[in-house]
């Protein structure tokens, strides 16, 4: 390979599998909430790598953890345990409802583990007939065949042949539908406390109460997918902490590594004991390099200063978006929680969320979609107020360009 090979967007099409359609911009450097591309153009990051970069880019604490552990020990496999993994598991246990932790590398893997555990728990405790998983329309739980089938979006799961069975999808926040569906055959109810890919839709308190009560009544487990909402994103360490219920199993990834691949499944001792030696595993899960960074992330995020700061920054971002909307009238509402917000396009602009992303990039702002009708924002939890203000100014210019077209 030539050392002077030009690495550009065209090269992606030449060498990569075409399952992504990345922008023409290729970032090469990031610091805090700002990113620079190959041409030196600067962007403010309101996307956060899809709610991953919870401390922005190249946070000093994470860089230090990476360098320090990188000079000690990289990988072992689970033939042996390691100190960073034990430390991180202990922090997660001490900070949540959980008593046991399983490490993986991605949200999909953590969710796969959660679903397998729920099935095995039900099989061993109640028999083979108790295998139904109840999930919800517009949910997203990952891209493995099991998780994508449990996620309630046919666009992601169709086209791969026969799907895993005994999965029931219901409308999100529909208590009556839930009451009609849950039975003694239900082994688990899986949901996001705030649907991300589905459009930034918060779970109603009454709905969550029904989920917990029906699960208890029918000896089913409640699985919270907190891959996107976890590690401070909503202003709580985990979103369930801002609700009146506690799940039986929780999955976490994305922000847990602040940009380094790591995930975990959290549960109780009584449930965890059903994953005996050899029933599940991951070669990289609990990798000391990943866990060292995860420890650094929790040390920074799990503090009153950062978690309270998320709620303050939410208000700044929400107020700014509403102020833009007062002028241009493009959104029907701004919804979400903490620093996971969605600006819902009104009837005139339905289906055009990608247009807003493209216009934002042209103005030097990175944002996200949550479906065709929602512009999603998931910036760093510690984004400076000046960057929020400048990002909003750039977004307003993007909105103005679309409104004037």
Curated annotation (Swiss-Prot):
Q: Which residues bind pyridoxal 5'-phosphate?
A: 107-108, 140, 225-228, 283
Question: What are the required cofactors?
Answer: pyridoxal 5'-phosphate
- Report the cofactor remark: Binds 1 pyridoxal phosphate per subunit.
Give the source's domain of life in one word: Bacteria
Residue numbers carrying N6-(pyridoxal phosphate)lysine: 254
Compartments in which it is found:
Cytoplasm
Which named protein is this? Acetylornithine aminotransferase
PROSITE patterns in alphabetical order: AA_TRANSFER_CLASS_3
Q: What else is known?
A: May also have succinyldiaminopimelate aminotransferase activity, thus carrying out the corresponding step in lysine biosynthesis.
The record's note on quaternary structure and interaction partners says: Homodimer.
The metabolic or biological pathway listed in the UniProt record of this protein is: Amino-acid biosynthesis; L-arginine biosynthesis; N(2)-acetyl-L-ornithine from L-glutamate: step 4/4
**Residues noted as binding N(2)-acetyl-L-ornithine in the record, renumbered to the chain:** 143, 282
Please name the GO terms that the record assigns under molecular function.
Answer: identical protein binding; N2-acetyl-L-ornithine:2-oxoglutarate 5-aminotransferase activity; pyridoxal phosphate binding
> Which Gene3D superfamilies did the record assign?
Aspartate Aminotransferase, domain 1, Type I PLP-dependent aspartate aminotransferase-like (Major domain)
Give the chief site where it resides. Answer: cytoplasm
Q: Which gene encodes it?
A: argD
Recorded family membership: Belongs to the class-III pyridoxal-phosphate-dependent aminotransferase family. ArgD subfamily.
A Gene Ontology BP annotation from the UniProt entry: L-arginine biosynthetic process
């Amino acid at each position: 390979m030539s050392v002077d090979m030009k690495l550009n967007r065209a090269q992606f099409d030449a060498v990569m599998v075409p399952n992504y359609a990345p922008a023409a911009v290729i970032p090469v450097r990031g610091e805090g909430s700002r990113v620079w591309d190959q041409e030196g153009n600067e962007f403010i990051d309101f996307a956060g790598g899809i709610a991953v970069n919870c401390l922005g880019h190249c946070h000093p604490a994470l860089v230090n953890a990476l360098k320090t552990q990188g000079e000690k020990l990289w990988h072992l496999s689970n033939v042996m345990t390691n100190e960073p993994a034990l430390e991180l598991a202990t922090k997660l246990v001490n900070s949540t409802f959980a008593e046991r932790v399983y490490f993986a590398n991605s949200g999909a893997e953590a969710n796969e583990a959660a679903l397998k555990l729920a099935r095995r728990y039900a099989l061993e405790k109640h028999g083979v007939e108790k295998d139904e998983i109840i999930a919800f329309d517009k949910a997203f739980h990952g891209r493995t065949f099991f998780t994508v089938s449990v996620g309630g979006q046919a666009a992601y799961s169709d086209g791969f042949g026969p799907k895993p069975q005994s999965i029931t999808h219901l409308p999100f926040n529909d208590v009556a539908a839930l009451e009609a569906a849950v039975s003694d055959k239900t082994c688990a109810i899986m949901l996001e406390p705030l649907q991300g890919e589905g459009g930034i839709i918060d779970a109603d308190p009454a709905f969550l109460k029904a989920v917990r009560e029906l699960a208890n009544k029918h000896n089913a487990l409640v699985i919270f997918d907190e891959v996107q909402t976890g590690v401070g994103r909503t202003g709580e360490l985990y979103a369930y902490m801002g609700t009146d219920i506690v799940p039986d199993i929780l999955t976490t990834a994305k922000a847990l590594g602040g940009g380094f691949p790591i995930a975990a499944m959290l549960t109780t001792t009584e449930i965890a004991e059903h994953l005996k030696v050899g029933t599940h595993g991951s070669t990289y899960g609990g990798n000391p390099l990943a866990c060292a960074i995860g420890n650094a992330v929790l040390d920074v995020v799990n503090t009153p200063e950062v978690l309270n700061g998320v709620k303050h920054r939410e208000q700044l971002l929400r107020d700014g978006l509403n102020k833009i909307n007062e002028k241009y009238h493009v959104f029907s509402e701004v919804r979400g929680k903490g620093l996971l917000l969605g600006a819902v396009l009104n009837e005139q602009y339905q289906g055009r969320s990608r247009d807003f992303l493209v216009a934002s990039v042209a103005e030097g702002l990175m944002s996200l979609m949550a479906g065709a009708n929602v512009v999603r924002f998931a910036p760093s939890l510690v984004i400076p107020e000046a960057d929020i203000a400048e990002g909003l100014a750039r977004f307003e210019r993007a909105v103005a360009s679309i409104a004037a077209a």
